[in-house]
Amino acid sequence: MSLKDFIFTSESVGEGHPDKVCDQISDAVLDAYLEQDPKSRVACETLVTTNLVVIAGEITSKGKVDAQEIARNVIRDIGYNDITMGFDADFAVVSAHVHAQSPDISQGVTEGEGLFKEQGAGDQGLMFGFAINETPELMPMPIYYSHELVKHLAGLRHGNKLKFLRPDAKSQVTVEYKDGKPVRIDTVVISTQHSPDVTHKQIEEALIEECIKKVIPANLLNNTKYFINPTGQFIIGGPHGDAGLTGRKIIVDTYGGYGRHGGGAFSGKDPSKVDRSAAYMGRYIAKNVVASGLADKCEVQLAYAIGVAEPVSVHVDTFGTGKISEEELVKRIRANFKLTPRGIIESLKLLEKGRKYRETASYGHFGRKGSTFTWEETDKASALKG
């Protein structure tokens, strides 16, 4: 994305969106296995539709987990606890269908086995990390405020501040840029599921005053257009309105389309899967590059071959904002970051006791605060700067 005048849009979805329900269930199952056995190999997929949950995948672990009960607890926490919504934690049919990880894959990711003795990547693939200095979190502004809106909306619902709110919700933020810098919010879209006993005008007024104006700074709301539940009604929602699947919100999970994506989803995957762990490392690297002042904007690509520990390539793009050459930056990255699967897991403490991947499954994996989000630390900035 070049430095010029443009308008850019990103979206987010709430914790009650069908795809996000699935992501949270998959990550809650992952957490339960890792808590009992840190060496668990987990690839957990979830499907939801009207009062039905199907869990499937490949899991090899010494742990014993009640996936059905975990799913019900997640659904209950989100707020689907009323059968009239068509999806209810206590009445949904929940089935689990899992089997062991293929031994052909296992030998490539288990240290001491396979053609290469070091722990190899769990699959081939390419992963991207991105950072930009237009928000304090070093995230693109459109996705940052999209997340903040649905997060605030969930807080209003759980706090019973707006009694008409129901779990399913989406947001979209359009930002106007001048000379590559954000100057104003052009458009905000919020669609939220609601109870039948509220008017569209009441919803519109409440969301503008209690959500949008509480989240987005007033100086950015300049001639901003608001579209609140623009179909006019959103009573039927959640898995009753649309089927959901794990891994179907990968752009919401990352940079809202502002940075590139390698195509691999995160939720339900243990850290041996570089789809997840290397994307976290990419963000860690890019954020430290920007935090160091070596670039205003940075995108990192890592690529792996299945069963091989070292990445097959490391690529950096600073979009003309770099203070040193990209070739020199790659050298410094290789010198300061461990890029093997084992090195990534150790550096980012991805198997640390008590870690909850479920926390990542709503409101984006990046630009977040808290001990879970170790890839958001900027402790390598000084070393990179040299």
From Swiss-Prot:
Cellular component aspect of the GO annotation: cytosol
GO molecular function annotation: ATP binding; magnesium ion binding; methionine adenosyltransferase activity
Highest taxon of source: Bacteria
Enzyme Commission code(s) on record: 2.5.1.6
Binding-site list for ATP: 17, 168-170, 242, 248-249, 265, 269
Gene3D superfamilies, A to Z: 3.30.300.10
Protein family (similarity comment): Belongs to the AdoMet synthase family.
Protein name (database record): S-adenosylmethionine synthase
Organism of origin: Leptospira interrogans serogroup Icterohaemorrhagiae serovar Lai (strain 56601)
Lineage of the species this protein comes from: Bacteria, Pseudomonadati, Spirochaetota, Spirochaetia, Leptospirales
Gene: metK
